[in-house]
Structure formats: C-alpha cells, structure tokens
Amino acid sequence: ISVDMALTRSCGAMCKFCYAMVQEPQERSAIRIKDALNLVDDFAEIGVKGVSLISDGESTLSPAYAPFIEHCASANIDVGNATNAWDWDKEKIERVLPHLTWVRFTVAAGSPGRYAEIMYKSKDDTHVFDNAMKNIKYAVELKKRLGLKVTLGIQMVLMPEFRDEIIPFAKLGVDLGVDYAVIKHCSDDTEGSLGVDYSKYEEMFDTLLDAESLSNETTKVIVKWSKIEEGNDCTYNAMY
C-alpha cells in the first residue's frame, strides 16, 4: 500500500507542460509540521509501506518536508520524491537523501536557455537551471560518497515543440551521472487545454532512438515508448 501526495500546493515553477498552468487560481497552503508527523503515524498504523511526494505542489517548499521524510524513515515507510530541485539546497539534501528511496528531478531541457523558457519565465532566466544542476550534482556526489542506495533520475516531459532538446537532455543526464534520464509524453485533457499535437510524436522516433543510444554503464536513457506511441488514444472506457 502506497500513498501519492504533496506537502504543499505551492510551486515556484511555471512549466508549460503542467496542467496547473491552465487551472483557476487556487489556495496554495502547506500542511503544518505537527499535522504532517501525525499523518505519518496514521500511515504506519494502517500499514502504508510507501509515500511518493509528487504532483499537486513542490513539496520541498514545505516547512514539513525534512521532518516528514525523517519521521517516515523512523516508521519504516519508504519515501520517493519528484522535485524541480530549485529549493533542494545542500542542507535539505544532507538531511533527507539518506532516507529516500528515489528522487526524480523534473528537467525540461538540456540547455539552460530552453530549460528556463519552458519551466520559468524566459530564456534569460538561466539562474534556475544553474541552481537546479548544482543541487542535483551535489545529490549525485553525496550518494556516491555515502554509498546510498537511493535511485536518482531526471525526467523530461516531451511536447513536440521541445524536440530540439531531446539529445541535449540525454547528454545532460549522462554528464550528471544520474541513474536514469527518462523521456515521457505530455498528457493533455480531453479538451486539449495544453495544445499537445500527438500526431507530431512519430516524427521524433529516430531522435528518441538516438537519445537512448547515449546510455552508458552509469546512466540509462529511457524513452516511455508505450505512451508516446499511444498518443491521445484512451485505453479505458470511463474515468471516475
């Protein structure tokens, strides 16, 4: 039994592939530390074995972030974390990395300008890229130094207009020395709010194969072919 959740609804990024960008403004409150720790106790009592801090918000922004993960560790609950690493500073990394099972970093592109353009305001805001890479590199170094078993990876959410960043992204993953660099398609809603043109994915197949060929013994470049080939075809009849 596992739980997917976030410790806050706040996020400093402005990712073009994120559905939150087309939603109405919402309250961005964060859970209180005491409530977060009590929640862990409840999880342990009912037999929850794992927690994934994903979606909804950037959990690293919550004051409860490190205490929550440390308390999960004391309760023998595995924790994974998806993050942009912007606020994942050295102090937080040192506190939480020994207790995490996996960390998946959202990295929209391999070049600083395109990364900033896709995930923030403009191609000139490359400081967000530089900061994220600094934090990811430190996590990779700390993992090696302490011999941690945590799996570290980067993920690109591929929209057709980002195709120029497929190879730079794969090369970045190899340069960082993370365990994997995964490329997945962008999920749109039935109304096409994000404007994803699924017919364009097939044109990128050769480039995606080239990206996979950059894998080495340290870093596996992975393309989620099933979803990319599936496009916007639904495999279910109803959603509740």
Task: Please name every model-derived segment.
Residues 19-22, 55, 83, 156, ...:
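Residue-level recognition of beta-strand->loop/alpha-helix junctions
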Residues 6, 26-27, 31, 45, ...:
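Radical SAM enzyme [4Fe-4S]-AdoMet core and its adjacent flexible, acidic
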Residues 21, 53-54, 225-228:
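Short linear capping/connector segments at secondary-structure termini
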Residues 1-35:
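Canonical Radical SAM [4Fe-4S] cluster-binding loop centered on the CxxxCxxC motif
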Residues 13, 23, 36-112:
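Conserved SAM/AdoMet-binding glycine-rich loop
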Residues 19-22, 92, 118-119:
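Short, flexible helix/strand-to-coil boundary loops that buttress conserved ligand/catalytic motifs
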